[in-house]
Amino acid sequence: LSDHGADVVFCARNADAVSELSSYSEGAGSVSGIVADMGDQSSTEEFISDVLSGGDVDLLINNVGASPSRNFLYMKDEDWTELHELNLMSAVRCTRAFLPAMREKKWGRVLMISSSAGKYPNAALVDYGTTKAAMISMGKSLARKYGSDGVLINSILPGLIHTAMWERAAGEIAEASGRTAEEVISNNGKGVPVGRYGTSEEVASLIVFLCSNAASYINGTAIEVDGGQASHL
């Protein structure tokens, strides 16, 4: 988005990650980061306040999430609550805070970065998939409500995307199965029709499009970025 002229404000829990990404200067727009924990209500509200102190928001990308793999029967209420706060309530709070100014200006974009797990349930990711399905539902509901105000709200459902999170997951699987992380990633990629994992840049390209005026009639959709892995009509 910065490459296309947007002034970007983001947050992350890791101060080093915030510092590294904030140093990006190749785009036409600025990039600034704030250390915040989207799984904590007060931290999220402080982040929102900091952002609004710099002016209104035209584009909101709800891109937060953790996807622990765990057994449903051994999960406690706290496990569900913590992931619900991080994955879903962060999007609820940010959307609620930034939407009014978009409505007033009669222009805005909100994107829910959900997951293919929100549409195709996986028992090992039951809590993650539940929160991501809720994001899709919220996006669809709000799109129907606020589309007439010029605010377009859509969801993006990434499939297998080669990220640091997947690197860690592959490492855990490799350790448990006696393989290397590279072998795990390669084997998983074979299950995708294009034969590989996707990249963050390929997801970002869709984000840029949906935030542009070229997507002025796209509202309430849930678009999969999965290399053709989904088999439904």
Residue locations for each model-derived region?
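Short C-terminal tail/terminal secondary-structure segment
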Residues: 120, 196, 208, 219-233
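Substrate-binding pocket helix/loop in short-chain dehydrogenase/reductase
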Residues: 71-72, 79-84, 188
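Alpha-helical segment proximal to the catalytic Tyr-Lys
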Residues: 100, 144-145, 216
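Short, small/polar-rich loop/turn modules that mediate ligand/substrate recognition or access, typified
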Residues: 147, 152, 218-220
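Active-site helix of classical SDR
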Residues: 95, 131, 139
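Residue(s) in the substrate-gating loop at a strand-loop-helix junction
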Residues: 115
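Conserved glycine-rich Rossmann-like NAD(P)H-binding loop of the short-chain dehydrogenase/reductase
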Residues: 6-20
